[in-house]
């Protein structure tokens, strides 16, 4: 299999320093998280400062309270993302090793779990401060895509979450024995850069659409519309990219080489696709509901 692109010589660490005999490093993935949070915070502040964007020209909350909301959201992302990975992808392993559930630094986060964590955190926050739930959801979801874009780029830099073997001109030869373990391939194994596919779809394309709807089409005046577009857009993007992503190792067996979580004969769906289908359905319901209500 011949690929045009070799994986660039990139380090997962932006820089590292040694203090008092201990090594500290800033990783690209951590920087992506930080930058995504800062961008989301600024977008939320800008939106709440523009009263004309909202129903009855009234933002759901004051710009000064965004930082307080952000604390709840970060907790929802971390707790939900970790528990989602544990429950959706490796429940048997963590049932046998429960102390490792809290070891977030070892890796293992799931977007769908993080999303559920954010939903719960935002719902509790709205109850506590008497904030319109759908407008709060719109405020949050229109800010998420830049973080998704940066996170997927960091996945690429880390040479992780790569795609299935491919001989397309833009396929990439990722380093490491796991990436090179391609049954039936002689020589170097090239793979779909599925991280970049996700960055383009759920980050750049979806993010541009959401910002255009908010700032050019007045979508925030229809509570739930932006939330619906985000849910359906992310779900559809993830569903499509799952056809190119390397299947989750815990689902791969000799009789199930594609790592399908649900299978009927030769066909089925991955866990990512199964979790994305409810997102698409719920997103479409939100969109239809919002469009039925006069702005």
UniProtKB/Swiss-Prot annotation:
Belongs to the Lgt family. It is an enzyme of class 2 (transferase). The keyword Cell inner membrane applies. This is Phosphatidylglycerol--prolipoprotein diacylglyceryl transferase. A 1,2-diacyl-sn-glycero-3-phospho-(1'-sn-glycerol) binds at residue 152. Catalyzes the transfer of the diacylglyceryl group from phosphatidylglycerol to the sulfhydryl group of the N-terminal cysteine of a prolipoprotein, the first step in the formation of mature lipoproteins. The keyword tRNA processing does not apply. Pathway: Protein modification; lipoprotein biosynthesis (diacylglyceryl transfer). Pfam families: LGT (PF01790). It is a multi-pass membrane protein. GO terms for biological process: lipoprotein biosynthetic process. GO terms for molecular function: phosphatidylglycerol-prolipoprotein diacylglyceryl transferase activity. GO terms for cellular component: plasma membrane. It comes from Ruegeria pomeroyi (strain ATCC 700808 / DSM 15171 / DSS-3). Its EC number is 2.5.1.145. It is found in: Cell inner membrane. NCBIfam families: lgt (TIGR00544). The chain crosses the membrane at residues 28-48, 69-89, 101-121, 131-151, 195-215, 224-244, 268-288. Its main location: membrane. Keywords: Cell inner membrane, Cell membrane, Membrane, Transferase, Transmembrane, Transmembrane helix.
